[in-house]
């Protein structure tokens, strides 16, 4: 795996996590 592939994989894993976190904070309020 190249550095670019690792970066893309991390980005793809991070985006849904951030969205889920923001949704969770909105529902918590």
Curated annotation (Swiss-Prot):
It comes from Synechococcus sp. (strain ATCC 27144 / PCC 6301 / SAUG 1402/1) (Anacystis nidulans). The chain crosses the membrane at residues 7-24. The gene is psaM. Keywords: Membrane, Photosynthesis, Photosystem I, Thylakoid, Transmembrane, Transmembrane helix. This is Photosystem I reaction center subunit XII. It is a single-pass membrane protein. GO terms for cellular component: photosystem I; plasma membrane-derived thylakoid membrane. HAMAP family: PSI_PsaM. Its main location: membrane.
């Amino acid at each position: 795996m190249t550095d670019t592939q690792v970066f893309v994989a991390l980005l793809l894993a991070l985006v849904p996590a951030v969205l889920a976190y923001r949704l969770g904070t909105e529902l918590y309020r």
